[in-house]
Regions:
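Short, cationic-aromatic polyanion-contact patches
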Residues: 5-11, 62-81
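Pre-recognition alpha-helix immediately N-terminal to the DNA-recognition helix
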Residues: 13-18, 29, 96
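Short helix-to-turn junction characteristic of helix-turn-helix DNA-binding domains
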Residues: 19-23
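Short acidic, hydrophobic short linear motifs in intrinsically disordered regions
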Residues: 24-34
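Short, hydrophobic-biased segments on the C-terminal half of alpha helices
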Residues: 45-49
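Glycine-centered, phosphate/nucleic-acid-interacting loop/turn motifs that mediate DNA/RNA or nucleotide
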Residues: 55
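Short beta-strand "wing" residues that participate in macromolecule-binding interfaces
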Residues: 58-59
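Amphipathic alpha-helical dimerization/coiled-coil segments
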Residues: 80-121
Length: 123
């Protein structure tokens, strides 16, 4: 499947976050890295297989064990996801998004200054 059009569920994203951090791992490694309450082994195993079908992870087989690793970078997924949010909720306008964040989430002056500096450095 094409990861460009796929979104991750909350559970899938949690497992991808772990795999991005670990770079690779068996189901037990993923479980060990999970915060409590941990999902069941079979649940994690099912989710990584779904991620594989979606094209987000691949595995290396060692007998009956599978070591999973991400096929997409965290930054790449984040960029696609945020572009989708920007287009779906803010009409593609970064200004509208920042305005929403400043009113709804109370962006601080120092955070606004950081954004301005980032924009100035892009020129």
């Amino acid at each position: 499947m094409n990861t460009k059009t796929q979104e991750l569920t909350r559970a899938e994203l949690e497992i991808m976050q772990i795999l991005w951090r670990l770079e690779k791992g068996f189901v037990n490694d993923i479980l060990e890295a999970m915060p409590a309450p941990k999902l069941a082994y079979n649940t994690v195993s099912t989710i990584v297989r779904i991620l594989e079908k979606k094209g987000f992870v691949e595995h290396r087989a060692y007998g009956k064990s599978h070591e999973y690793y991400p096929l997409i970078l965290r930054e790449e997924y984040t960029s696609r996801f945020m572009t989708g949010v920007l287009n779906s909720f803010f009409g593609g306008s970064i200004g509208n998004m920042v305005s929403f964040l400043s009113h709804d989430k109370g962006i601080t002056v120092s955070e606004a200054d950081e954004i301005i500096k980032m924009l100035q450095n892009k020129k």
